[in-house]
Amino acid sequence: MSKIIGIDLGTTNSCVAVLDGGQVKIIENAEGARTTPSIVAYMDDGETLVGAPAKRQAVTNPKNTLYAVKRLIGRKFDEKAVQKDIDLMPYSIVKADNGDAWVEVRGKKLAPPQVSAEVLRKMKKTAEDYLGEEVTEAVITVPAYFNDSQRQATKDAGRIAGLEVKRIINEPTAAALAFGLDKTEKGDRKIVVYDLGGGTFDVSIIEIADVDGEMQFEVLSTNGDTFLGGEDFDQRIIDYIISEFKKEQGVDLSKDVLALQRLKEAAEKAKIELSSSQQTEINLPYITADASGPKHLNLKITRAKLEALVEELIERTIEPCRVAIKDAGVKVSDIDDVILVGGMTRMPKVQDKVKEFFGREPRKDVNPDEAVAAGAAIQGSVLSGERKDVLLLDVTPLSLGIETLGGVMTKMIQKNTTIPTRYSQTFSTADDNQPAVTIKVFQGEREIAAGNKGLGEFNLEGIPPAPRGLPQIEVTFDIDANGILHVSAKDKGTGKENKITIKANSGLSEDEIQRMVKDAEANAEEDHRLAELAQARNQADALVHATRKSLTEYGEKLEAAEKESIEAAIKDLEDILKTGDKAEIDAKVEALSTASQKLGEKMYADMQAQQQAQQQQAADNAKPVDDNVVDADFKEVKRDQ
């Protein structure tokens, strides 16, 4: 049975792991790194770069290099958070026909799941290279506070990448799995997972219990902010650099796309350096130019300055912690361990804030970049039956309900309910002889439905005429283990029923997903074609070089016509190298090989002659120098003493 891999699809970086021989293995990518930047670049020759190669060229290709796309996944274009990102991102965020936030690259509109699928494809390939077999199934992690549309969109991304997503699992829960199975501490423990990543923040309170030899992970509560993460910290530094440069040089860099990309790189580097040193210097020569000539940027930033810039962002993570503790029905003093996940938790100020709130030192023995992927791989092994000693009880992060008379949100399933779960409630009509009802489904905590996230709607028709309040309509909410919602409505009188799987009132249709899957497959074929073309060019290049070298050494031994025919074949091959396809290059390589046959014969004959000459010389050296050797007589003369 093939392995189910675990993928942490992050805003900034992604990671892939697998359970191999009972141990979790974090798999290195083709570049030798254990994490891969979640960056996709679309080149002008049609090639798609993913990961470190995409990141390296971002400065020169900012409009077609997509990063932090996870912040857009499953979101509407008109949402406040998306509108804020439009001004910050160098690439173009556009409104899709269904109202979703999409991106536009080189004149083509792409859905965020399509872009995320490119990253997932690289993760899939990384795992396949390591395992030496095809991988078709995965567990993918999402922020615990992701709503239904965002979870559905992540699942779609997996499908587009050619993966069957066996389970969508919450990031903090995955980290708890990795932590819990690795530890020797016995007995029940309550832990907090504080997960501050590149684009999202989550906090979960989880109880780990040993039930008859089985490790049980029960999520007691979860909370968070899906638009708060390392990208926001970077932005604070960028804004500061821009304002300082404007004060000094009078030039506004915020409108210069190329400069902004360099600033982003520098800000991220400075942020990382300031976690281990007290001061860093940002040095960007030729950042811009005006009438007086080129301008250079040189700026020192201290750790204290960075902390002042981002203090409010760190403070924003504490309120969700407070709510999560309250919802879990525990006290801060009941917490046994605090686990830090996500690259941003390496920042000393973040660690101090967490320690201050929870009153204990966070654990340092969990790798914040790899724990989530490791947990996903463990869940994969549970689903494949490889491990049978783990039970995971996750929760739905937000309340789910329907809109009832007066626009009120009637909650069917409360937040932090353990999933999978099912709940039914009976409703009635609001008017006499009402022939149909519209069931509008919402997710969120507000009392008025319009203040929450609309997930979808459907009609139940054919209700027989009756006074208001008489028909009985049973509405059932069913959440599966992925946290994805299925809703049905049934008229108890007639038995008529209608149901939907919530796909958001937008999201990708089945046709769109299928088209994107085909696109992705075509892309894979195109990548293969480009790789073959590159190989053909390299081989042709090597042949031209070798033939030229031989021609210089042995050319005078050829007849003029033979030499001319080889030189013409070399020129033909060189002409086709840059523009030709593989078949054309192969044909010219064949022609050059045929033309240089005579040259090969001359080289071979010459080498044979040289070898014979060397053998002859060796034989001569082995003979005595003179055959006329004369034996000499000698006589011993004894002298008198």
Swiss-Prot record:
<dbReference type="Pfam" id="PF00012">
    <property type="entry name" value="HSP70"/>
</dbReference>
<dbReference type="InterPro" id="IPR012725">
    <property type="entry name" value="Chaperone_DnaK"/>
</dbReference>
<dbReference type="InterPro" id="IPR043129">
    <property type="entry name" value="ATPase_NBD"/>
</dbReference>
<protein>
    <recommendedName>
        <fullName>Chaperone protein DnaK</fullName>
    </recommendedName>
</protein>
<dbReference type="InterPro" id="IPR029048">
    <property type="entry name" value="HSP70_C_sf"/>
</dbReference>
<dbReference type="InterPro" id="IPR018181">
    <property type="entry name" value="Heat_shock_70_CS"/>
</dbReference>
<keyword id="KW-0597">Phosphoprotein</keyword>
<dbReference type="GO" id="GO:0051082">
    <property type="term" value="F:unfolded protein binding"/>
</dbReference>
<dbReference type="InterPro" id="IPR029047">
    <property type="entry name" value="HSP70_peptide-bd_sf"/>
</dbReference>
<feature type="compositionally biased region" description="Basic and acidic residues">
    <location>
        <begin position="632"/>
        <end position="641"/>
    </location>
</feature>
<dbReference type="GO" id="GO:0005524">
    <property type="term" value="F:ATP binding"/>
</dbReference>
<keyword id="KW-0547">Nucleotide-binding</keyword>
<feature type="compositionally biased region" description="Low complexity">
    <location>
        <begin position="608"/>
        <end position="619"/>
    </location>
</feature>
<feature type="modified residue" description="Phosphothreonine; by autocatalysis">
    <location>
        <position position="200"/>
    </location>
</feature>
<dbReference type="InterPro" id="IPR013126">
    <property type="entry name" value="Hsp_70_fam"/>
</dbReference>
<keyword id="KW-0067">ATP-binding</keyword>
<comment type="function">
    <text>Acts as a chaperone.</text>
</comment>
<keyword id="KW-0143">Chaperone</keyword>
<dbReference type="GO" id="GO:0140662">
    <property type="term" value="F:ATP-dependent protein folding chaperone"/>
</dbReference>
<keyword id="KW-0346">Stress response</keyword>
<feature type="region of interest" description="Disordered">
    <location>
        <begin position="606"/>
        <end position="641"/>
    </location>
</feature>
<comment type="similarity">
    <text>Belongs to the heat shock protein 70 family.</text>
</comment>
